[in-house]
């Protein structure tokens, strides 16, 4: 059945994880129709795994590519297709009652990550310890003038880390300047999830299915040196490994489960208040409550 391609098993969950956390972690890949977290009725805590059902099979596949063996609350999680069974009373909703299967896969959850996330240096210093002043001189800075509804909301200024990810930074810079004949001007932030991220960059289809890079095709993940350590970080959206185009997102909070899956290539240096205005137009399912447009964009020279 098609449902089996849309439902994911997620194992290795920390005690702190609930349906809201899972929704925030998996919603970037597509619309979610259901989340189930089976409970241990003796302890009244969840059993360390959950099931996430997507509207579309391709979205579920993208979630597996991005989230399997990623980190969530300090633990490495396991994500794969679930094995559903149907409720006998005529319902089409799967029920996760195959305990032998659950024991088999929930037993394979990986150990808690040994490295403390809190030991990371602040993003302004970065992992390489390069002074901020030197980075500001050597790396390009770009801007986006944002319009919410029909009113100007302000400017977001971003530093692009060409010293760490030159290919990714150059792609974004050129899409801001339109020097290749196409780019972000006039496009929208099509997916906005409060306390998570604001995603844009689809200037062809305007719905998250399009966009293109300056290289004429999807390009590879350059590296994962920079991390999703807090709000205001600029990172590439993708549909799996090595599928970078033009879509990007700005973080509204720490999103460390995306580390190693999405390439961070810049940070907001001015206009975090504008990002918060964009964030306020979001919703749990990612659909903006109000149109958010990149009215103009370019490079500081």
Curated annotation (Swiss-Prot):
UniProt keyword RNA-binding, yes or no: yes
PROSITE patterns: CSA_PPIASE_1, CSA_PPIASE_2, RRM
Residues modified to Phosphoserine: 91, 97, 119
UniProt entry tagged with the keyword Isomerase: yes
UniProt KW keywords: Isomerase, mRNA processing, mRNA splicing, Nucleus, Phosphoprotein, RNA-binding, Rotamase, Spliceosome
Signal peptide coordinates: none
EC number, as in UniProt: 5.2.1.8
GO BP term, example: mRNA splicing, via spliceosome
Pfam family, one: Pro_isomerase
Catalytic activity annotation: [protein]-peptidylproline (omega=180) = [protein]-peptidylproline (omega=0)
One annotated Gene Ontology cellular component of this protein: mitochondrion
Subcellular locations according to the entry: Nucleus
Domain RRM: 5-83
InterPro entries: Cyclophilin-like_dom_sf, Cyclophilin-type_PPIase_CS, Cyclophilin-type_PPIase_dom, Nucleotide-bd_a/b_plait_sf, PPIE, PPIE_RRM, RBD_domain_sf, RRM_dom
The PPIase cyclophilin-type domain, residue ranges: 143-299
Region (Disordered): 107-140
GO molecular-function term, one example from the UniProt record: poly(A) binding
Family the entry assigns: Belongs to the cyclophilin-type PPIase family. PPIase E subfamily.
Domain notes: The RRM domain mediates both interaction with RNA and with KMT2A (via the third PHD-type zinc-finger), but has much higher affinity for the KMT2A PHD-type zinc-finger.
Subunit-structure text: Identified in the spliceosome C complex. Component of the XAB2 complex, a multimeric protein complex composed of XAB2, PRPF19, AQR, ZNF830, ISY1, and PPIE. Identified in a pentameric intron-binding (IB) complex composed of AQR, XAB2, ISY1, ZNF830 and PPIE that is incorporated into the spliceosome as a preassembled complex. The IB complex does not contain PRPF19. Interacts (via RNA-binding domain) with KMT2A (via the third PHD-type zinc-finger).
Physiological role: Involved in pre-mRNA splicing as component of the spliceosome. Combines RNA-binding and PPIase activities. Binds mRNA and has a preference for single-stranded RNA molecules with poly-A and poly-U stretches, suggesting it binds to the poly(A)-region in the 3'-UTR of mRNA molecules. Catalyzes the cis-trans isomerization of proline imidic peptide bonds in proteins. Inhibits KMT2A activity; this requires proline isomerase activity.
Identification of the protein by name: Peptidyl-prolyl cis-trans isomerase E
């Amino acid at each position: 059945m098609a449902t089996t391609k849309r439902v994911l098993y997620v194992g290795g969950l920390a005690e702190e994880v609930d349906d809201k956390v899972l929704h925030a972690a998996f919603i970037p890949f597509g619309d979610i129709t259901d989340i189930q977290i089976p409970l241990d009725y003796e302890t009244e805590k969840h059993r360390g795994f959950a099931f996430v059902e997507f509207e579309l099979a391709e979205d579920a596949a993208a979630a597996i590519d991005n989230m399997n063996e990623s980190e969530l609350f300090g633990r490495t999680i396991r994500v794969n297709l679930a094995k559903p069974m149907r409720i006998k009373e005529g319902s089409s909703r799967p029920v996760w009652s195959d305990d032998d299967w659950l024991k088999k896969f929930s037993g394979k959850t990986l150990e808690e990550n040994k490295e403390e996330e809190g030991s990371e240096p602040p993003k302004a210093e970065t992992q390489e310890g390069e002074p901020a002043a030197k980075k500001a001189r050597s790396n390009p800075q770009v801007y986006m003038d944002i319009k919410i509804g029909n009113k100007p909301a302000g400017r977001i200024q971003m530093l692009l880390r060409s010293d760490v990810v030159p290919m990714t930074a150059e792609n974004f810079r050129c899409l801001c300047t339109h020097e290749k004949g196409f780019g972000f001007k006039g496009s929208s932030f099509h997916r906005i999830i409060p306390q998570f991220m604001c995603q844009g960059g689809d200037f062809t289809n305007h719905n998250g299915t399009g966009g293109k890079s300056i290289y004429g095709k999807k390009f590879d993940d350059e590296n994962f040196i920079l991390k999703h350590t807090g709000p205001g970080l600029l990172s590439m959206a993708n549909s799996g490994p090595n599928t970078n185009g033009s879509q990007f997102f700005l973080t509204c909070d720490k999103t460390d489960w995306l580390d190693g899956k999405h390439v961070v290539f810049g940070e907001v240096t001015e206009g975090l208040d504008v990002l918060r205005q964009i964030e306020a137009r979001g919703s749990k399912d990612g659909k903006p409550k109000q149109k958010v447009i990149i009215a103009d964009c370019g490079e500081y020279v």
